[in-house]
UniProtKB/Swiss-Prot annotation:
The gene is sucC. Mg(2+) binds at N196, D210. Pfam families: ATP-grasp_2 (PF08442), Ligase_CoA (PF00549). Its EC number is 6.2.1.5. This is Succinate--CoA ligase [ADP-forming] subunit beta. Pathway: Carbohydrate metabolism; tricarboxylic acid cycle; succinate from succinyl-CoA (ligase route): step 1/1. The keyword Metal-binding applies. ATP binds at K46, G53, R54, G55, E99, S102, E107.
């Protein structure tokens, strides 16, 4: 689960990570009524969307007066912000965050993520933070260092002193912030915390000028206070609907809808669709216990995308028996009167019985025995 920058800074504040003071506004009028709480002559106005790259896209503005801040807020509210992370359709700005300006001496990058190879959190630090961090990673990887974390000691500052020209005082201040975000990471079951930039001010203080936190969806039941931060307006409505039925769904830009059991098989299915020259419209994992109802809902979600021109169902029967899933497919197809081509590949437990159910259904369902064959058939039907 993602949250907005202003919400992430509220979390930081609880863990004593220094952040600039600010407030949320949904209109220019709110700026005038709230700006008195900020002790600054310069203000930063930031569009609040669940995507990075806002600065380069015009979603972060520096205002040198209250009137200018109001105008920026007025311009941003309701606009569609397109960044390299939003996709071409962009995201609508419904809120902005107005905060005190900071005197910036130097920008750094600091994040905490889960390393899938090590199966534990790691810190990532760079002396070149800011809007161009992606370019730094691409062109100057030596300026980025990863820290393996010993859970017993959290942050080890020795690599900072050996890789970067930092004073003992700078290392101490960065280490203190790193330890605090590690505490926040563990306490909230976060999957990622990012500060970009972490700035050193002219007075020598370090402040989290931006904040990003993602949380582990599987741990949210332990954190009702974090669930309250969820902004459904920022999420894809199909993904919200899918979560109600235990379906893992991610909308994409292609024309072939996918219904698969198992995340690995789902990714392999999308890969082979691309291999044969088409694009998947979604990732959809129905899990290991799908029923007629969940299959029906899965079809509804897939077909709610007007770009879908065909559907590939790829099921490997293990816990999920192929005859049960076949019955669910037939029932759902009859109920919904599916008009687009439907290719079904069944393999595993009771797959022969499943194929027989499909054949005797009287529906125009195209059967396939192998994934390669299934992908070629659906690509041919769509093209």
């Amino acid at each position: 689960m993602n949250i907005h920058e202003y919400q992430a800074k509220e979390v930081f504040h609880k863990f004593n990570v220094p952040v600039p003071k600010g407030f949320v506004a949904t209109s220019a009028e709110e700026v005038k009524t709230q700006v008195s709480q900020l002790k600054s002559d310069v203000f930063v106005v930031k569009a609040q969307i669940h995507a990075g790259g806002r600065g380069k896209a015009g979603g972060v503005k520096l205002a040198k007066s209250v009137e200018e801040a109001q105008q920026f807020v007025k311009d941003m509210i309701g606009m569609t912000l397109v960044t390299h992370q939003t996709g071409p359709s962009g995201q609508q700005v419904r809120k902005v965050y107005v905060e005190e300006g900071s005197s910036i001496k130097k920008e750094y990058y600091l994040s905490l993520v889960i390393d899938p190879k090590l199966s534990r959190p790691i810190f990532i630090f760079s002396s070149e933070g800011g809007m161009d961090i992606e370019e730094v990673a691409k062109n100057s990887p030596a300026k980025i260092v990863k820290f393996d974390i010993d859970p017993a000691t959290s942050f080890d500052s020795s690599k900072l002193s050996s890789r970067f020209h930092l004073s003992p005082e700078q290392i101490e201040k960065i280490s203190n912030i790193a330890k605090k975000i590690y505490d926040a990471f563990i306490a909230t079951d976060a999957s990622q915390i990012e500060i970009n930039p972490l700035v050193e001010t002219n007075s020598g203080d370090f402040i989290a000028l931006d904040a990003k936190i993602n949380f582990d969806d599987n741990a949210l039941y332990r954190h009702p206070e974090i669930m309250e931060l969820r902004d459904y307006d920022e999420e894809v409505k199909e993904e919200i609907e899918a979560s109600k039925y235990g379906l893992s769904y991610i909308k994409m830009d292609g024309s072939i809808g996918c219904m698969v059991n198992g995340a690995g098989l789902a990714m392999a299915t999308m890969d082979i669709i691309k291999y044969y020259g088409a694009e998947p419209a979604n990732f959809l994992d129905v899990g290991g216990g799908a029923s007629k109802e969940t299959v029906t809902e899965a079809f509804k979600i897939i077909l709610s995308d007007s770009n879908v021109k065909g559907i590939l169902v790829n099921i490997f029967g293990g816990i999920m028996r192929c005859d049960i899933i076949a019955s669910g497919i037939v029932a759902a197809a009859k109920e919904m009167s599916i008009k687009v081509p439907l290719v079904v590949r069944l393999s595993g437990t009771n797959f022969e019985e499943g194929k027989k159910i499909l054949e005797e259904s009287g529906l125009n369902i195209i059967a396939a025995d192998e994934l390669d064959e299934a992908a070629q058939k659906i690509v041919k039907e769509v093209k």
